[in-house]
Curated annotation (Swiss-Prot):
MF terms (GO), sorted A to Z: iron ion binding; S-ribosylhomocysteine lyase activity
Organism: Histophilus somni (strain 2336)
HAMAP family reported in the protein's UniProt record: LuxS
Gene designation per UniProt: luxS
Gene3D superfamilies hit by this protein: S-ribosylhomocysteinase (LuxS)
A biological process from GO: quorum sensing
Entry annotated with the keyword Metal-binding: yes
Designated name of the protein: S-ribosylhomocysteine lyase
InterPro entries recorded: LuxS_sf (IPR037005), Metalloenz_LuxS/M16 (IPR011249), S-ribosylhomocysteinase (IPR003815)
Length: 168
């Protein structure tokens, strides 16, 4: 099985919160697709709570679109990582890391402005697979933590995993 790009970076050297360009590609029609690693937590040291990450999933995607989508950029998807240390964001376009960091910070402020569970979009049994598994309080704590720490930038060249460590 081929080694995925996300496993070619040294997770022990990742900073968080931080933005990283995980992958870029071009479609057959010539559109640029960029995948960003939005690392909320330091890998293997911190983790997002299940209810908090689920509530973020419902809120973050909409707020990021509000702050980042433009004539040149369109978010395709924002999905939580299985390891619960962040999200992957796929989009059409090539914003720089600082644009993404700014949108992320603005989105965290928007999350803090959500005052009650009833304001969480798609929070019902018809649109959510586990609609009872949410915590606005956890989402607020995560957002506050991101804003207090500030969003940095992780560069792939700084995180390249040594060949000797691959598959070890």
């Amino acid at each position: 099985m081929p080694l995925l790009d996300s496993f070619k970076v040294d997770h022990t050297r990742m900073n968080a919160p931080a933005v990283r360009v995980a992958k870029t590609m071009r479609t057959p029609k010539g559109d640029n697709i960029t995948v960003f690693d939005l690392r909320f937590c330091i890998p293997n040291k911190e983790i997002l709570s299940p209810k908090g990450i689920h509530t973020l999933e419902h809120l973050f995607a909409g707020f990021m679109r509000d702050h980042l989508n433009s004539e040149q950029i369109e978010i395709i998807d924002i999905s939580p990582m299985g390891c619960r240390t962040g999200f992957y964001m796929s989009l059409i376009g090539m914003p720089n890391e600082q644009q993404v960091a700014n949108a992320w910070s603005a989105s965290m402020q928007d999350i803090l402005n959500v005052k009650n569970q009833a304001e969480i979009p798609e929070l019902n049994e018809y649109q959510c697979g586990t609609y009872t598994e949410h915590s606005l309080e956890d989402a607020h704590n995560i957002a506050r933590n991101i804003l207090n720490r500030g969003v940095g930038i992780n560069k792939n060249e700084d995180l390249l995993l040594d060949d000797n460590l691959l598959n070890s």
